[in-house]
Amino acid sequence: PNADFQNVGKIHALIQKREAAYKQLERAQSQLESASNQLVKINSQDNATLPKSELKKTIATLKLAKLDHKTFDAYYKELTDAEQDFFDTVAADPSDKAGIEDALGQLNQYDSSLGQQADIVEANLQSVTADAQSLHAAALKMK
């Protein structure tokens, strides 16, 4: 192939869309970390009316989500490196079938692993949402 798939056309558009989604995920993760820090501070207060059980559960779920996000982030960075290696390999010698297949195989492995990690992140976010709703309901009962 003689086209620059990385920087023009449909593949480029997909890469841009993925990068925008990743940036959105990073912003959301930053908000979750801020919320987690606030909940930890609230939980450390000596207040008998605080819903301690719900607070602890939500904090634990947020901590797990943060750890799994770090793993997702590591796989994402490896995927982008493998993607760049693939594009570089194709650009260097489009006739190097073995080199291209190796680079594509590596890219596919990271893509598959990232997909699995995305499923874990999604499940964690569902748990965070459920726990936050329980905490919210318990906080409303404090009034």
Where are these regions (language model features)?
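Short, charge-rich amphipathic alpha-helices with coiled-coil/heptad character
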Residues: P1-I11, Q45-L62
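C-terminal amphipathic alpha-helix
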Residues: P1-K41, A65-K143
